[in-house]
């Protein structure tokens, strides 16, 4: 993970740690002219590592976004932001996207009253995301919510009730709330 964030910059979904600035000798050696290919590859890798996708999954999302009407890049980011694991991360119910994936895989999360164990589940507007009524599930989420530093900067397409361990998807995300800087 640290090699990835050192090479690509801060990836908030992958880890909460930040790369050190200026002290990296390798970056000074690699600071030549960047080709278009290198820029596109780095941006693609940022997407992959931030959202925790394989190459094949990313290609499927690009294909779906290409078929839809509108800007392919904006639609791609909207599709990725509406994944269940990413929404849990944005709500503050998990500290990272891999942590959110683990919560979903271990069946701690309900969407509209049903257990969902697929992290790539695409959430829709008016979906209600809750935890299981088990004590262990609620304790896990409570620890994440209590320790999450970005409670006040919740995107406007999401609302959370931290006392009932419940989140609500209000609408599809706006482009200004997407947390990753992509060229």
UniProtKB/Swiss-Prot annotation:
SUPFAM superfamilies: Alpha-L RNA-binding motif. One of its GO terms (cellular component) is small ribosomal subunit. SMART domains: Ribosomal_S4, S4. It holds the Pfam family S4. Residues 82-143 form the S4 RNA-binding domain. Keywords: Chloroplast, Plastid, Ribonucleoprotein, Ribosomal protein, RNA-binding, rRNA-binding. One of its GO terms (molecular function) is rRNA binding. It is found in: Plastid, Chloroplast. Part of the 30S ribosomal subunit. Contacts protein S5. The interaction surface between S4 and S5 is involved in control of translational fidelity. This is Small ribosomal subunit protein uS4c. The gene is rps4.
């Amino acid at each position: 993970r640290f090699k990835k964030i050192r090479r690509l910059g801060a990836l908030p979904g992958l880890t909460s740690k930040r790369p050190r600035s200026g002290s990296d000798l390798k970056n000074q050696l690699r600071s030549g002219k960047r080709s278009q290919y290198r820029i596109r590859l780095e941006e693609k890798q940022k997407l992959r590592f931030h959202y925790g996708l394989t190459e094949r999954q990313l290609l499927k999302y690009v294909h779906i976004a290409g078929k839809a009407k509108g800007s392919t890049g904006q639609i791609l980011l909207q599709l990725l932001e509406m994944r269940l694991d990413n929404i849990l991360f944005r709500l503050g119910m998990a500290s990272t996207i891999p942590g959110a994936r683990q919560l979903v895989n271990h069946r701690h999360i309900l969407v509209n009253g049903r257990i969902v164990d697929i992290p790539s589940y695409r959430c829709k507007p008016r979906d209600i995301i809750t935890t299981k009524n088990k004590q262990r599930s609620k304790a896990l989420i409570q620890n994440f919510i209590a320790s999450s530093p970005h409670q006040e900067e919740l995107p406007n397409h999401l609302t959370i009730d931290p006392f009932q361990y419940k989140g609500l998807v209000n609408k599809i995300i706006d482009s200004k709330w997407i947390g990753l800087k992509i060229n």
